[in-house]
């Protein structure tokens, strides 16, 4: 029994993080697609900036947006500052040609996006966060794939750096892996979910987000797939985000995302209908369902079953595998101790981030099951 559990759990983890990407690579390694608009023919775009209590960064965000290499006559900029109790709306209003939407009632990010998108006047809408900085060419790179009529949405590239500007080794490495995976997904069929820091979609494909939705970005992008359009990935559409200032803030963010992932299974269950969406079902199950539901518990069961196999006198192979796991978790513990002191070392930080991420997934499952996760997003200190 324990041998079966061990191999099943190992299989789930290996397939989710290695097997699925390898399959995508094999099936699509020859596909190369490049779309672009000719200079002077760029489509008009509405940019929506979600900005709840972002007085510290909204000015720099708007300056960054206005400095993008894109025809200003083709841009509409909207700041959704709903529920903000600081000077976010006032600061944003000081910029010319910026539409500021502000009400005192706070309903959550999903409600803010639903309202803001009604004010978008252009056919392509870009959603971005106030704490995300874009490179000069990002908007052109993000919009280029829309030259293909089958493209319904485009996900940008996310980079996480420290306050000093250095890449965050654990999370940064994870996002490099995710970026590579998105490249393979784009070649195969579609990116499964887009990060809310930066993505674009055709306005006509937008489906209003239920107000109790936790991960609004995922809901919006999967609904694009439901209309048989692709979500592409633009590797050169770079957005940069400063990592959370504290482990506590990062923990809350990851638990919230994990809870949102579990919620998405009930909201977007038809993505698991292989008769209606065969390719999407394969990708959704392999990339999202396995990670959200199975991988974190599988890591726990893998360790427990390994311990029991060694105690029951199984072959030395299981003893070596257990020793590897112990060393891995020891490194993760050291990484945690270093992170508490705002220090990092690659050898320890990567195991720590992996454990931290999966522990947050477990907590998110429990939190959502208990109905404890609020739809209101809390801004992390950065």
Kindly label every feature range from the protein language model:
Residues 63-74:
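Short, acidic, metal-binding catalytic loop of nucleotide-sugar glycosyltransferases
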Residues 146-164, 168-177, 212-216, 220-287, ...:
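Catalytic donor/gating beta->alpha subdomain of glycosyltransferases that bind UDP-sugars
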Residues 26, 31, 38-39, 291-373:
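Membrane-embedded multi-pass helical conduit in multi-pass membrane proteins
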Residues 125:
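Short aromatic/hydrophobic "clamp" motif used to bind/position activated sugar donors
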Residues 72-78, 89-119, 157, 165-169, ...:
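Conserved donor nucleotide-binding strand/loop of the catalytic core
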Residues 1-39:
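N-terminal membrane-anchoring/stem segments of glycan-assembly enzymes
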Residues 64, 81-89, 105, 132:
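A conserved acidic beta->alpha catalytic loop
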Residues 56-60, 74, 85-94, 137:
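Acidic helix N-cap motif at the loop->helix transition within catalytic regions
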């Amino acid at each position: 029994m324990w041998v079966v559990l061990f191999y099943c759990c190992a299989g789930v983890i290996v397939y989710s993080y290695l097997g699925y990407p390898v399959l995508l690579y094999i099936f699509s390694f020859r596909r190369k697609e490049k779309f672009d608009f000719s200079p002077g023919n760029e489509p008009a775009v509405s940019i929506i900036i979600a900005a709840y209590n972002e007085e510290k960064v909204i000015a720099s965000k708007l300056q960054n947006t206005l400095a993008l290499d894109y025809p200003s006559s083709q841009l509409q900029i909207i700041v959704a500052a709903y529920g903000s109790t600081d000077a976010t709306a006032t600061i944003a209003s000081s910029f010319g040609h910026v539409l500021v939407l502000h009400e005192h009632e706070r309903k959550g990010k999903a409600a803010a996006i639903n309202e803001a998108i009604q004010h978008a006047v252009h056919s392509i809408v870009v959603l971005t966060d106030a704490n995300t900085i874009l490179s000069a060419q990002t908007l052109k790179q993000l919009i280029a794939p829309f030259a293909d009529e089958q493209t319904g949405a485009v996900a940008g590239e996310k980079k996480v750096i420290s306050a000093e500007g250095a890449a965050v080794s654990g999370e940064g490495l994870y996002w490099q892996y995710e970026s590579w995976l998105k490249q393979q997904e784009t070649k195969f069929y579609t990116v499964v979910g887009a990060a809310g820091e930066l993505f674009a979609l055709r306005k006509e494909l937008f489906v209003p987000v239920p107000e109790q939705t936790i991960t609004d970005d995922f809901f919006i992008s999967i609904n694009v797939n439901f209309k048989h359009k692709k979500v592409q990935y633009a590797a050169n559409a770079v957005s940069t985000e400063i990592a959370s200032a504290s482990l506590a803030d990062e923990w809350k963010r990851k638990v919230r995302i994990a809870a949102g992932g579990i919620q998405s299974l009930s909201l977007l269950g038809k993505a698991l209908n292989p008769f209606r969406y065969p390719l999407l079902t394969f990708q959704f199950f392999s990339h999202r369902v396995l990670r959200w539901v199975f991988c974190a518990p599988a890591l726990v069961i893998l360790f427990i079953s390994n311990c029991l196999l060694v105690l029951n006198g199984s072959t030395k192979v299981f003893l070596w595998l257990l020793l590897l796991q112990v060393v891995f978790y020891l490194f993760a513990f050291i990484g945690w101790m270093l992170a508490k002191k705002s220090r990092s070392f690659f050898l320890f930080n990567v195991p720590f981030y992996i454990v931290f991420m999966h522990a947050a997934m477990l907590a998110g499952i429990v939190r959502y099951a208990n109905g404890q996760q609020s739809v209101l997003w809390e801004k992390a200190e950065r």
